[in-house]
Amino acid sequence: MADPKSEKSLVLRVARATAKGFFHLPASATLVHAALLGGMPSAVPPPALAPASAGAFDWPVCSEAERLVSVHLEAFLLRNAFARRLAARLRDETGTDFFEWVDHLVVAPEEAKAFLAAGFEREKVEAPRGTTVLWHPRAMMPRVLLPPGGGHGEVPSVLALRTEGLGDFLAAHDLDVPIEGEFGARLRRALVSDENGTRLQAVERLGGRGFLVREPTAKFVRSALAARELWRTRKRDFATDAEGVTHALARLEAVLALVDRDAACDLFFAEERRFWEARNRAARVQKRRQDRLGLGWGNHDHHTFRCSRAHFADLNAFLQRLGFQKRERYYAGAEAGWGAQISEQATAGIVVFADVDLMPEETAIDFSIQRLPAAPRLGTVGLWCGLHGDSFLQAGMHHLEARFDFARLRDQLAAEGIRTMKPFSDFEFLRQAFTEGERWTVRSARVAALRQQGLLTAEQAESFLRDGAIGSHLENLERHGGFKGFNQKSVSAIIAATDPRNIREAQAG
């Protein structure tokens, strides 16, 4: 538990821009180095994105926007003791920053000018009459609501935290308060504390970005429960992967007959996290820590799917059917033997990083839609899929990346017996590292198939049968300035470092 004596001096890490001095350049001028490739943002309703083949975009480090949000959050914390205690517990018990859990804040209308100057824009979304909603289209920032009488200067009148399950949050904090919205509502919320003119709320979303609680119909509730069960019971292992893909696509259509694609997307990824978590100890430990505060994986950043060349186009078609829009695409075939398509479903708030083996001569094609032929050799991603199955099918996600206080999480997990590999991104605006990988048993039939195709040596085959191979990770990530992008060279380095043929677990950073 946090020391109560430290609460008054807690200048929350939320005020990162000033407390740590990370950012000093104006958001309008600050762009990440050209080596960091980015893409166009999504919106709701999603705008037309520039095709990835048209060129790469640099995501900005929006330090002024972060500073502005942080100032408002700090002002709220100074007046709301429950929120202040929770911020300290998040830091000390989960290794996370209060900032990363904020869904939205409600401020005075006169604050609009400052937020607009920092890069926020008006969003057309369902909200109370007379309320302006602002979002940042180029950065990961909480949204801002400006209703009449919405705050006092820099002090928000309301701050809402994003939970994975609202009932879990209330139970974790022993709160006997009503929940607005039954299960199945796009937005559910509860009042957590009301102190000194500030109200702390907790919210739960189901494929929605709006700010009005609308009770679902009984039919929709039944449909949502049925859809969740269809995803949870999806069969993953078939005689051939083609059969598995066909089954997944059929299951998708069955779900879409029950609910809209935004709800279907939200429910699908909740089950994918559940499946991945069951196969990764670091994930279970951290989930338990976050569940103690009733938050679940509300801090997820992106979901990483490794895919075979044969079914990469199928995975991307599946995602687009769920409402994903393609963002940046990485072509690292000549550099490191891999490529990746990043996609975003803005309404559900889900980002997918899907990677695949890529040959040097394939860097000029749109490999997200063009079917890739069998390759004469396996890269890191292809071998992982050969040993364990595709993430879309048997293996589940390679990793979930969530947003943390990087150093605190590393140290706190170490105390739980979980080591962290050396960072593969170590910038002021982006730090990333894997927990040491979970070693999985490899089926003999998979090894035999790879041997028969000449893709493994006898020595490698023997090693995988005897020792297994690294399967999945939890990724520790810390972002600043709302930076949304990734570092291609850093990803190349970690892909090479986790190749099952020559993996040597890095020393803890």
What are the roles of these predicted feature ranges?
Residues 7-509:
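Extended, well-ordered protein cores
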